[in-house]
From Swiss-Prot:
InterPro entries: Cyt_b/b6_C, Cyt_b/b6_C_sf, Cyt_b/b6_N, Cytb/b6-like_sf, Cytochrome_b, Cytochrome_b_C_euk/bac, Cytochrome_b_N_euk/bac, Di-haem_cyt_TM. Component of the ubiquinol-cytochrome c reductase complex (complex III or cytochrome b-c1 complex) that is part of the mitochondrial respiratory chain. The b-c1 complex mediates electron transfer from ubiquinol to cytochrome c. Contributes to the generation of a proton gradient across the mitochondrial membrane that is then used for ATP synthesis. Heme b b562 binds at H84, H183. It holds the Pfam family Cytochrome_B. GO terms for biological process: mitochondrial electron transport, ubiquinol to cytochrome c. Keywords: Electron transport, Heme, Iron, Membrane, Metal-binding, Mitochondrion, Mitochondrion inner membrane, Respiratory chain, Transmembrane, Transmembrane helix, Transport, Ubiquinone. This is Cytochrome b. GO terms for cellular component: mitochondrial inner membrane; respiratory chain complex III. Heme 1 (or BL or b562) is low-potential and absorbs at about 562 nm, and heme 2 (or BH or b566) is high-potential and absorbs at about 566 nm. Heme b b566 binds at H98, H197. The gene is mt-cyb.
Length: 380
C-alpha cells in the first residue's frame, strides 16, 4: 500500500502529528478545550485587527475620529470594532480558565510548557494594554499615563526610562504611534511563542484530570477531540457574536467615549476588567516601588508554582485540602478584581490590602502547606 501523504510530506507531517494522529488521553474534559479556544481567539483578533488597521490612523489629532469613521462609515466596521474589543475579554476569560485548569490538575509540572505559557500571558497583557490606548479616549490616555508612569519607580534610570517610552515629556503623538506599532507586532510574536508552547507540550503529551500516566489509554486527536474543540468554537463564537451585537459596550468604560484631554483627569482611572486584580495589588501598597514589584510578582508568581509543588500526587482531583486552597485563590482573585474597580476610599483600601497579602500567602505558604497536609492525610 502506498504511504499516506499526510504522514510522509515534510510539512503535512508536522500538521498530522499535531492535529490529526496526535495521541491524546481519552479522559480529558472540556477544561482542555481552552488551549484551542485561545488559538481561535488569537486568529479572530488578528483578522479583525487587520481590517481595523486598514482604516485607523495612529495620530492624536485623528485617532478618535478614525474610530468614529470605522463605526459609522466603513462596511461592518462597527462589527469589526465590537468583535475586536469584546474578543479581548473572551481571550482573557479563556486564558484565566486555561491557567486555572493548569494549577488544579498539576499541568505546571511540564515546566517548559508552563513557563512559556506565563511568557505568553505577559505578552497578551502587554498587547491588550497598548491596544487600549489606541482609541485615544479619556481612559486610554490616562490609563497610558498612569501605567507607563510606574516605570519611574525604577531607581536611578526611572525618569529617563519613562521619557524614553513616551518619546517626549508626556503621553503624546509619539507614544500613540509606537503603541500602535507594538500592538500590530505583538500578536505575531504571540503566535510564534504559541508554536513553542505546543512544541514543548507535544514532547510530553497532554496531562489528564487524574494526573496519572495515560500512555496505556490514548486515542487519536482527530476525529474525537477535533469535533469536541469545534463544539467549543461554536459556543464561544456564538457568545462573542451575541455580546458584540446586543450589548457591545458592557465591558468598556463610558469615560472612553470622551476624546483624550490632558487637562481633565477622570474621577476614577481604572484599566479593563481583566487587569483589575493586578491593579488592586499595585494600589494596595503605599510605596511606589513596592507596588510595582508586587504588580510584577503577582504574575511572575505563576513561574514559582512548579517549585512549590510538595504533593505526592499531581492532580488536585484526590486532594480535598488543596482543592479548598485552590478555590480560596479563585475567590480572593475575584475580590481583588472587584476592589480594583472601586474608588480609593474606606473600606475598599483595607479590603484591598488584606486581599493582596492573602493572594501571596495563599500561593507561597498555604498551598504548599496543604499539599504536604494532603500527603499526611492520605498516608502517602
Amino acid at each position: 500500500m502506498a504511504p499516506t501523504m499526510r504522514k510522509t510530506h515534510p510539512l503535512l507531517k508536522i500538521i498530522n502529528n499535531s492535529l490529526i494522529d496526535l495521541p491524546t488521553p481519552s479522559n480529558i474534559s472540556y477544561l482542555w478545550n481552552y488551549g484551542s479556544l485561545l488559538g481561535l481567539c488569537l486568529m479572530t483578533q488578528i483578522l479583525t485587527g487587520l481590517f481595523l488597521a486598514m482604516h485607523y490612523t495612529a495620530d492624536t489629532a485623528t485617532a478618535f475620529s478614525s474610530l468614529a469613521h470605522i463605526c459609522r462609515d466603513v462596511n461592518y466596521g462597527w462589527l469589526m470594532r465590537n468583535i475586536h474589543a469584546n474578543g479581548a475579554s473572551f481571550f482573557f476569560i479563556c486564558i484565566y480558565l486555561h491557567i486555572g485548569r493548569g494549577i488544579y490538575y498539576g499541568s505546571y509540572l511540564f515546566k517548559e510548557t508552563w513557563n512559556i505559557g506565563v511568557i505568553l500571558l505577559l505578552l497578551v497583557m502587554a498587547t491588550a494594554f497598548v491596544g487600549y490606548v489606541l482609541p485615544w479616549g479619556q481612559m486610554s490616555f490616562w490609563g497610558a499615563t498612569v501605567i507607563t508612569n510606574i516605570l519611574s519607580a525604577i531607581p536611578y534610570i526611572g525618569n529617563n526610562l519613562v521619557q524614553w517610552v513616551w518619546g517626549g515629556f508626556a503621553v503624546d503623538n509619539a507614544t500613540l504611534t509606537r503603541f500602535f506599532t507594538f500592538h500590530f507586532l505583538l500578536p505575531f510574536l504571540i503566535a510564534g511563542t504559541s508554536m513553542l508552547h505546543l512544541l514543548f507540550l507535544h514532547e510530553t503529551g497532554s496531562n489528564n484530570p487524574t494526573g496519572l500516566n495515560s500512555n496505556s489509554d490514548k486515542i487519536p486527536f482527530h476525529p474525537y477531540f477535533s469535533y469536541k474543540d469545534t463544539f467549543g468554537f461554536m459556543i464561544m463564537l456564538a457568545a462573542l457574536a451575541l455580546l458584540s451585537t446586543t450589548n457591545p459596550n458592557l465591558m468598556s468604560d463610558p469615560e472612553n467615549f470622551t476624546p483624550a484631554n490632558p487637562l481633565v483627569t477622570p474621577p476614577h482611572i481604572k484599566p479593563e476588567w481583566y487587569f483589575l486584580f493586578a491593579y488592586a495589588i499595585l494600589r494596595s501598597i503605599p510605596n511606589k516601588l513596592g507596588g510595582v514589584l508586587a504588580l510584577l510578582f503577582s504574575i511572575m508568581i505563576l513561574m514559582l508554582i512548579p517549585s512549590l509543588h510538595t504533593a505526592k500526587q499531581r492532580s488536585m482531583m484526590f486532594r480535598p485540602l488543596s482543592q479548598l486552597m485552590f478555590w480560596s485563590i479563585i475567590a480572593n482573585t475575584l475580590v481583588l478584581t472587584w476592589i480594583g474597580g472601586q474608588p480609593v476610599e474606606d473600606p475598599f483600601i483595607l479590603i484591598g490590602q488584606i486581599s493582596s497579602a492573602l493572594y501571596f500567602i495563599l500561593f507561597l505558604v498555604l498551598l504548599p502547606l496543604t499539599n504536604w497536609s494532603d500527603n499526611k492525610m492520605l498516608n502517602l
